Amino acid sequence: MIPISSDVFPFQVLAVARYLQEQPYVKASQITAVGWSLGGGAVLAALGQLTAAENSPLRAVVAYYPYCRDLQPWQAKVPALSLMGAQDEVAPPEVCQRVFEQLPPGTALQARVYPEARHGFDVSDLPPYAKFGSEIVGYNAAAEVAAAREVQQFMSRKTD
């Protein structure tokens, strides 16, 4: 098996978006990348691979409890929504917030932190409190509903 580094994930996100743009059954102006955890970090990191002036293949990005340890500030003008749990031990929101504070003024980012939510807050198969390695993860119905509402509102503003 060939090991795959998470460094390639942002490039994969953009490659898939560019591929989808070429498909006749896809409305190319409406492609949104959505990721959870490491995938959430990947969709945000994909923005770092775009220049401010570049015509992005992405209409928007949504990141659920993104893993931001290696995330760098970006210049791209693509709207982004980040949904995080204040109690997240796997992907602490403070790590993302430090990056978000370095974004250029006018960056189209909405960051929401749900006070009682943990990593996996929208995974209804999880109990509210479960061990994941040395960290605690868990479902939070209130955060799941609030995040779903937030995504719906965010996406309704991003459609033609």
Regions found by a protein language model. Give the residues of each.
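Short glycine-enriched nucleophile-adjacent loop
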Residues: G40-A53
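Short alpha-helix in the alpha/beta-hydrolase fold that links the catalytic acid
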Residues: P92-Q102
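Acidic catalytic loop of the alpha/beta-hydrolase fold
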Residues: Q87-A91, H119-G120
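Alpha/beta-hydrolase active-site loop
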Residues: I2-P24
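C-terminal catalytic histidine-bearing segment of alpha/beta-hydrolase fold enzymes
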Residues: A108-D160
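Alpha/beta-hydrolase fold nucleophile elbow
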Residues: Y25-S37
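A conserved short beta-strand
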Residues: A53-Y67
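Short beta-strand/loop motif that positions the catalytic acidic residue
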Residues: S82-M84
